[in-house]
Regions:
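Structured extramembrane domains adjacent to transmembrane segments
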Residues: 20-21, 30-73, 363-475
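Acidic, serine/threonine- and proline-rich intrinsically disordered appendage/tail regions
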Residues: 480-486
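Transmembrane alpha-helical hairpins and terminal membrane-anchor modules
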Residues: 264-335
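Hydrophobic transmembrane signal anchors and adjacent membrane-proximal interface regions, especially
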Residues: 4-6, 14-18, 33-35, 349-356, ...
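A sequence-level detector of short, solvent-exposed, charge-rich linear segments
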Residues: 131, 329, 333-341, 370
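Membrane-proximal, non-transmembrane alpha-helical segments
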Residues: 194-277, 281, 468-474, 478
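Acidic, Ser/Thr-rich low-complexity segments on the non-lumenal side of membrane proteins
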Residues: 340-380
Length: 486
């Protein structure tokens, strides 16, 4: 299964979180993803102005394991795996702080904090999407209670490692996890408070506020920074610190994927064939003229010059032909997906400009299914079409090896910076005039936007699915991303 989530990452970047979820009973899992970008022709994006190297500079891809899924109540109630694992790691490390046990202790801190972060996010999203009004109070009360219990349970672990056998640096690992859990819990509690107040659920908002203040008191006691009103310098440090903490906590989930060119051996083989055929042509011409006119004659001399001129052209033309064939069959880059020195699988990626007639009918039908104007429906051919494709292979057995947790797959977090797309846009606003009801002429400031259409074609287990998104852009950056239902 492939799960796709889109959002605006920043003013000039869109983010696609692509989850490649493996089947439990299938060892080898293969996925394919094609992203069709329909770019307005007025932006002057084409092969000459936007080569492959520039596209890959604009695209950033992070590969990471999908965080194991637990409910908040599962983390704090009964024999919960995350809490049990972290407690056992703390006890063993405190008794015998060897390098191996310290490494396991740090790993369990990171996993526990990452699992809590995902659980808070998912349950808050569920509360907001809940349509059964009578369940709202129970869901919110459970969220507040369980979030508070998780913080208390983690704080209680400190007594296990606050021992003379534990080095100071090891305690700092614990405190980093504590600070991150406090920060992320407060962030989601604030979001819940705002949501509750908007629905006049003041009693629940009061409970959430009490938890927020309790966590804040704990943070101040341990010297963790908090957001302060009218203190930009302090808040700058807070943002930087939180960003570093987030990277530290999630570092064990990220996978290495060193890239290299795909199809290099086949490409060189084709190029060698091209050189050989060109040389064969020159040799045949040389032998033919030598046989007819003899050696050291003027006709032979002229024939040799012409044959070598044509040989180089034939060689280049055949190199171009073979390169096109290799490019259509192979990808630009290939990377091994590696976690803790274990190769979990591989991924391939490729990008190219595609002519409209070569776009699959299903993709073009979805692109044409909804237009903002009638004129646009006949103007699709003026768009430039970029195809970015990925192929992913995952070995599920290796994915599950050497871990107490069950990982369902990997996330490929793709960020596309659109700075090169907006270089040739007109000003973001234009002054237009209209006649008011009283007959006066009014000047109105109007937005000038451009629309980038993205069609996703993803395939797994012989099943193909499609999604379309409309990205609203202006000279000032990205305004919105909306899914267009065909």
């Amino acid at each position: 299964m492939i799960e796709i989530d889109t959002r605006i990452h920043d003013r000039y970047s869109i983010e696609l979180k692509v989850g490649f979820v493996t089947r439990k009973k299938l060892r080898m899992n293969d996925f394919s993803l094609a992203m069709w970008f329909f770019v307005p022709g007025s932006l002057d994006i084409n092969r000459a102005t936007y080569p492959k190297d520039m596209f890959y500079q604009d695209v950033k891809s992070n590969i990471r394991l999908i965080t194991p899924v637990f409910l908040l109540r599962e983390i704090v109630e009964g024999p919960a795996l995350p809490l049990r694992n972290i407690r056992e790691a703390f006890i063993q490390m405190a008794s015998n702080p060897t390098r191996t046990l310290i490494s396991e202790y740090e790993y369990q801190i990171k996993m526990f904090a990452a699992i809590v972060k995902s659980a808070l996010r998912d349950e808050l999203a569920h509360i907001k999407q809940n349509r059964i009004g009578s369940d709202t109070e129970t869901l919110c009360d459970g969220f507040i209670r369980n979030a508070g219990k998780i913080c208390d349970e983690y704080v209680g672990l400190r007594t296990i490692i606050n021992a003379p056998t534990v080095p100071e640096g090891v305690m700092r690992m614990y405190l980093s996890g504590d600070e991150f859990i406090c920060d992320i819990t407060c962030k989601h509690i604030l979001e819940l408070i705002e949501w509750l107040r908007g629905r006049k659920l003041d009693e629940l908002a009061g409970k959430a506020t009490a938890l927020y203040r309790r966590i804040g008191k704990h943070m101040r006691q341990l010297g963790y920074p908090e957001i302060r009103k009218d203190d930009r310098l302090h808040n700058r440090i807070f943002i930087h610190r939180f960003s570093i903490l987030k990277k530290y906590i999630e570092s064990d989930l990220y996978l290495r994927a060193p890239k290299r060119r795909d199809g290099v051996i086949v490409e060189q083989l084709y190029f060698s064939i091209a050189a050989g055929l060109a040389m064969l042509f020159a040799t045949v011409v040389s032998f033919a003229f030598q046989k007819k006119f003899g050696s050291l004659t003027l006709p032979l001399f002229i024939a040799l010059i012409i044959s070598y001129m044509l040989k180089d052209r034939i060689k280049e033309l055949m190199r171009y032909y073979f390169a096109h064939r290799v490019g259509s069959k192979y990808f630009d880059n290939k990377a091994k997906i590696i976690h803790k020195d274990t190769e979990l699988g591989w991924l391939k990626e490729g990008v190219d400009f595609i002519e409209p007639e070569k776009v699959p009918a299903d993709v073009m039908t979805l692109r044409n299914s909804s237009h903002l104007t009638e004129v646009e429906s006949g103007n699709v051919t003026a768009e430039k079409i970029i195809l970015y494709r990925k192929s992913v292979h995952i070995d599920r057995d290796k994915l599950q090896a050497n871990s107490e947790y069950s990982f369902s797959g990997i996330n490929d977090i793709i960020r596309l910076n659109v700075t090169n797309f907006i270089k040739k846009m007109d000003d973001p606003s234009v002054l237009m005039r209209t006649l008011d009801d009283d007959g006066s002429i009014q000047t109105v400031d109007c937005d000038r936007d451009y629309y980038l259409n993205l069609v996703l074609q993803y395939q797994y287990d012989n099943t193909a699915e499609f999604k379309r998104f409309r990205i609203d852009l202006s000279r000032d950056g990205i305004k919105s991303i909306e899914e267009v239902v065909g």
